[in-house]
From Swiss-Prot:
Residues 25-34, 86-92, 135-153, 197-221 are cytoplasmic. It is linked to Carey-Fineman-Ziter syndrome 1: An autosomal recessive multisystem disorder characterized by hypotonia, bilateral congenital facial palsy with impairment of ocular abduction (Moebius sequence), micrognathia, glossoptosis and high-arched or cleft palate (Pierre Robin complex), delayed motor milestones, and failure to thrive. GO terms for biological process: muscle organ development; myoblast fusion; myoblast fusion involved in skeletal muscle regeneration; plasma membrane fusion; positive regulation of skeletal muscle hypertrophy. GO terms for cellular component: Golgi membrane; plasma membrane. It comes from the Eukaryota. It holds the Pfam family DUF3522. Residues 1-3, 56-64, 111-113, 175 are extracellular. This is Protein myomaker. A lipid is attached at C217, C218 (S-palmitoyl cysteine). It comes from Homo sapiens. Its main location: membrane. InterPro entries: NGX6/PGAP6/MYMK.
Amino acid sequence: MGTLVAKLLLPTLSSLAFLPTVSIAAKRRFHMEAMVYLFTLFFVALHHACNGPGLSVLCFMRHDILEYFSVYGTALSMWVSLMALADFDEPKRSTFVMFGVLTIAVRIYHDRWGYGVYSGPIGTAILIIAAKWLQKMKEKKGLYPDKSVYTQQIGPGLCFGALALMLRFFFEDWDYTYVHSFYHCALAMSFVLLLPKVNKKAGSPGTPAKLDCSTLCCACV
């Protein structure tokens, strides 16, 4: 019985894999991204907890609301991670981020289960990044960004992201509990890898700005 309960609770516990992602994003001064990851963590964990045994007391929101925002938060996390990788200056950065916030909300309201829920934001972000980087390569007449970015960030990050999506859409029928839990872990790892080492647009260099957990929680609530 204990093993069964632990198995049912595993998707909830595995969603805590986003917690290190929140911490790392904040330390790298990606404060907006950290808040999005925390938002995702909250709704994904609560959604799975409400589906678990003996935890219905935690369900202070309707199931369809939890389901919607867990999917929305995940898709939005993908979008802001890729926009952070693109490294746009203002006002382009905030414009593209808000474009994703609005269009993803409408897309998921229309259909939250299709492949397009995640492939749409990812595909659009990749096209935007490719257009910017190709222009930079043309101006620089060389590779942009540095080779290390491709080998240490983009390659591993996209591999973990692809693994997460394959687990989510093609392998959950094998064993939902374990596969979905690995999906959470792979997705969190993808976000960490795709985020640049430091947010160059966060202000003057020096000691990174502090953002404690209470600020993040208040912003999400």
